[in-house]
Swiss-Prot record:
Heme b b566 binds at residues 97, 196. One of its GO terms (biological process) is mitochondrial electron transport, ubiquinol to cytochrome c. The cytochrome bc1 complex contains 11 subunits: 3 respiratory subunits (MT-CYB, CYC1 and UQCRFS1), 2 core proteins (UQCRC1 and UQCRC2) and 6 low-molecular weight proteins (UQCRH/QCR6, UQCRB/QCR7, UQCRQ/QCR8, UQCR10/QCR9, UQCR11/QCR10 and a cleavage product of UQCRFS1). This cytochrome bc1 complex then forms a dimer. This is Cytochrome b. It is a multi-pass membrane protein.
Length: 379
């Protein structure tokens, strides 16, 4: 008798995706982050759903409703901090996942890669709108500053900003719509994740060597299911440790002050996971130029496959490219640090140098070094 998991219309989809899926035998821990992102998304949707049951999206009561969740709702503090720090874990896994793709040449699967970029934008938009909801000082001023950037768009900019705000400033209408979109977007993200996986399973996974692994495949279950479960346990332990021991470590103290349109905080900055892009934005003195650089800092990932000049897919066996890759990582850490600093000397020039280096490495140095490596292969 044929196994039900191979014949049932629903079970056979799950079976071909998570049980009998042929996977390369050489996948390292870097391939764990896709499944970890799935767990993060699940945690965020569940905690967010329960938080939404107690939250009110009104400027008069939003801040107090979050306080009420933490003080009066059973385990409300746990839900709130799991959700806030879960977002941080989400972005850690997201950046490591993208970094893995860059290092091992996974971007050569262009459909999967492009859906991934869409996912990155969607998750960033979701996180930004979520940060506005507690209606603290940094929520209000972050929303004001970031949405106001759209006014740099010629002709339609000002109208666009007022349309997003629902008025002439960030107010009740803005908060209500941000809550609606913050609730909706994770489900759109979930749908995009399914499309992402659909395209991935069309080609099969890449592997650390970058060499086709068709002759050497193993079933996903039990090998990679066990490996993924270990990853879940490590990540959830890290998240629980963060939530239970220092839940406010990655947050901003200013967000415990209720939003006040008449008092500007000394340093307006987004959450840590946006600081690298914020530093690039601030490093350009022109408003429109800054906005374009901000968008390009993420959108540049879309042209990485076009800039691939190496004869080898992965950086595993390339002598020079990994040095540039780790320099890029160092530049991103520098930008993250600069994004959290005030706009003054020497931070301005460090930010500008790091921003130029970021684009230079991806657009020019990586393709050039790859061509040098191709030449070295002939020796």
């Amino acid at each position: 008798m044929t196994n039900i998991r191979k014949t049932h219309p629903l079970l056979k989809i799950i079976n071909s995706s998570f049980v009998d899926l042929p996977a390369p035998s050489s996948l390292s821990t870097w391939w764990n982050f896709g499944s970890l992102l799935g767990v993060c998304l699940g945690v965020q949707i569940l905690t967010g759903l329960f938080l939404a049951m107690h939250y009110t999206s009104d400027t008069a009561t939003a801040f107090n409703s979050v306080t009420h969740i933490c003080r009066d709702v059973n385990y409300g503090w746990l839900l709130r901090y799991l959700h806030a720090n879960g977002a941080s874990m989400f972005f850690i896994c997201l950046y490591l996942h993208v970094g893995r793709g860059l290092y091992y040449g996974s971007y050569m699967y262009s459909e999967t890669w492009n859906i991934g970029i869409l996912l990155l934008f969607a998750v960033m938009a979701t996180a930004f709108m979520g940060y506005v909801l507690p209606w603290g000082q940094m929520s209000f001023w972050g929303a004001t500053v970031i949405t106001n950037l759209l006014s740099a768009i010629p002709y339609i900019g000002t109208d666009l900003v007022q349309w997003i705000w629902g008025g002439f400033s960030v107010d009740k209408a803005t908060l209500t719509r941000f809550f609606a979109f913050h609730f909706l977007l994770p489900f759109i993200v979930t749908a995009l994740v399914m499309v992402h996986l659909l395209f991935l399973h069309e080609t099969g996974s890449n592997n650390p060597t970058g060499i086709p692994s068709d002759p050497d495949m193993i079933p996903f279950h039990p090998y990679y299911t066990i490996k993924d479960i270990l990853g879940f346990l490590i990540m959830l332990t890290a998240l629980a440790t963060l939530v239970l021991f220092s839940p406010d470590l990655l947050g901003d103290p200013d967000n415990y002050i209720p939003a006040n349109p008449s008092i500007t905080p000394p340093h307006i900055k987004p959450e840590w996971y946006f600081l690298f892009a914020y530093a690039i934005l601030r490093s350009i003195p022109n408003k429109l130029g800054g906005v374009l650089a901000l968008v390009m800092s993420i959108l540049i990932l879309a042209i990485v496959p076009i800039l691939h000049t190496s004869k080898q897919r992965s950086m595993m066996f390339r002598p020079l490219s990994p040095c540039l890759f780790w320099l890029l990582v160092a530049v991103l850490f520098t930008l993250t640090w600069i994004g959290g600093q005030p706009v003054e000397h020497p931070y301005i020039i460090i930010g500008q140098t790091a921003s130029v280096l970021y684009f230079l490495i991806i657009l020019l140095l990586m393709p050039m070094i790859s061509m040098v490596e191709n030449y070295l292969l002939k020796w």
